[in-house]
Amino acid sequence: MVVPSTAPASDDLFRRAQRVVPGGVNSPVRAFRAVGGTPRFMTSGSGPRLVDADGRTYVDLVCSWGPMILGHAHPDVVQAITAAAARGTSFGTPTPGEVELAELIVERVAPVEQVRLVNSGTEATMSAIRLARGFTGRPTIVKFAGCYHGHVDALLASAGSGVATLGLPDTPGVTGAATADTIVLPYNDLALVEATFAERGDTIAAVITESVAANMGVVPPLPGFNAGLRRLCDAHGALLVFDEVMTGFRVSRTGWWGLEGAVEGWAPDLFTFGKVMGGGLPAAAFGGRADVMARLAPAGPVYQAGTLSGNPLAVAAGLATLRACTDEVYATVDARAADVAGIVSTALNEQGVPHLLNSAGSLFSVFFTDATAVIDYAGAKRQASERYAAFFHSMLDAGVYLPPSAFEAWFVSAAHDDEAVERIAAAAPAAARAAAAVGAPVAVGGGAV
């Protein structure tokens, strides 16, 4: 089945949305600015599939940017949300469910001794860096170019995700004062981190890093990079903050730390989580060492709060999702991700399209580049984004929904069945031909359309 390029219902909805919503969307990457055309307005999802406002079905390789690891409308999650809603949607009080969810996170991720629930990954990272500053009494945060930690002002400098998609170096509204205590370094450059600590180590409160950089496309840490950050933080009395909003409970039951730090014998001081832990509803968390978390109000002086933190519906969805994420689920997701990545790479190879496929666990992305490696933001930006746009639209027309940006990770779910994979395989050759037909000027700075 080939999906026509036109989408009258989505066209109409987008026109209506642009009158009342800035840019017509509630998060920039959804607007298709990087690939052109009209964003598809989705009305329902089931398993690995989405249905748009025109009634057309797509195999989904976005999975709500990661949370839908079990697929859409998983019966256990739907039942949990329905039952929770019947009991009341919000109380503004502690609930038994939030204790259970916190206990489950602490049980799965050993270095997390205490955890605080919030509503979004942005809240989690914002709170984690405030806590790190409050605990150490130091002002400076080190982050890495291309890593995205939400839209908190102090961390939006040289960020990935939508900032990369739109080709923005920074954003108006973030003042110099807000980022004055933020140092941005190239990702995977441990020597430069070491030099920075040597010069300013007594001012650095924390280093925050995505466990795997996945908001400039997927760029795994080089061997020893994360462990090196741990060593340098220890040597200078700084905290290491691991942003596992994307990888947490997605690449394994214990997140990326379980695949790397747990094996190598080191751990961050603080973690941030989101996406999968909310089961598709707004939920996130930050947690870590008990002595650090003890500085949070009301136990300590570092203030953090939220009216809807620990919302009963989000907690119920998160509990149902995490409980359903068995070792078998992770094995299935890993296998399906490898299948899809292999199909796409084979199709591009057959058409002679230069590309690089990066992966970390079940996260992967395709860079349209002739480089032999992409290890940082500068390398991620040197790709032919016009080819990605052509590939994207051909797949979309064939009923496969990809991330509408070359700077985002691709996701599969445990619900991606043989039929879904076969549809991807059927669509990939034509998409590769479409990419091959496009010239390859290198896009530096996001390639916004």
From Swiss-Prot:
EC numbers, comma separated = 5.4.3.8
Enumerate the cofactors the protein uses: pyridoxal 5'-phosphate
> Under which main EC class is this enzyme filed?
isomerase
- Subcellular location as annotated: Cytoplasm
| InterPro entries xrefs | 4pyrrol_synth_GluAld_NH2Trfase, Aminotrans_3, Aminotrans_3_PPA_site, PyrdxlP-dep_Trfase, PyrdxlP-dep_Trfase_major, PyrdxlP-dep_Trfase_small
**Record's catalysed reaction(s):** (S)-4-amino-5-oxopentanoate = 5-aminolevulinate
Name this protein carries in UniProt: Glutamate-1-semialdehyde 2,1-aminomutase
- Which species does this protein come from? Parafrankia sp. (strain EAN1pec)
